Amino acid sequence: MFGKKNKAVTFSYDDGVTQDIRLIEIFNKYGLKATFNLNSELLGTDGSLVREGRVVNHTKNKPEDIKHIYDGHEVAVHTLTHPNLHKTEDDNEVLRQVEQDRINLSELVGYEVVGMAYPGGGKNCDKRVAEIIKNNTLIRYARSGDVTKSFEPFDDLY
């Protein structure tokens, strides 16, 4: 996969927040690339999160700005509305959350989006969800936020 090298460093950021604009400026300055995992139905919404006791802006970039903001970087699926897919009992809803987000994002960026990050952090997918995605969408890889404490590449791309 990586020629003679067998390890890689990746940068991956979730939710399509306005802070990505500054982050991308820094990445571009130093010739770095990243993947940005977006929820197409949440684009353009205001929000905030509490992190380490501080309120942090979590406002999403607007749909009409996505192509320009993320140009030169990968955009990937993060589902339409950020549900915990392994807790979503309806297989059709899992499929809708993933494939419709992929279609929406592909239209916004002008190329086929084929990557995905499961929403929710930690161990946030199961075999059922992975099989739905693998067998019914155009997604070619999906990653979890699960902490492995290992630098070993995954055997299964879903």
Residue ranges of each PLM-predicted region?
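A short acidic, amphipathic alpha-helical/loop segment
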Residues: 22-26, 128-132
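Metal-dependent polysaccharide deacetylase catalytic core of the NodB/CE4 family, i.e.
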Residues: 30-126, 136-137, 145-158
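N-terminal pre-catalytic segment of deacetylase/amide-hydrolase enzymes
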Residues: 1-11
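Short, glycine/acidic-enriched loop or turn micro-motifs at the edges of active sites
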Residues: 17-18, 81
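Generic hydrophobic alpha-helical membrane-span motif
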Residues: 20-21, 84
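Short, low-complexity, polybasic intrinsically disordered segments
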Residues: 131-135, 140
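Structural motif
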Residues: 3-4, 108, 133-134
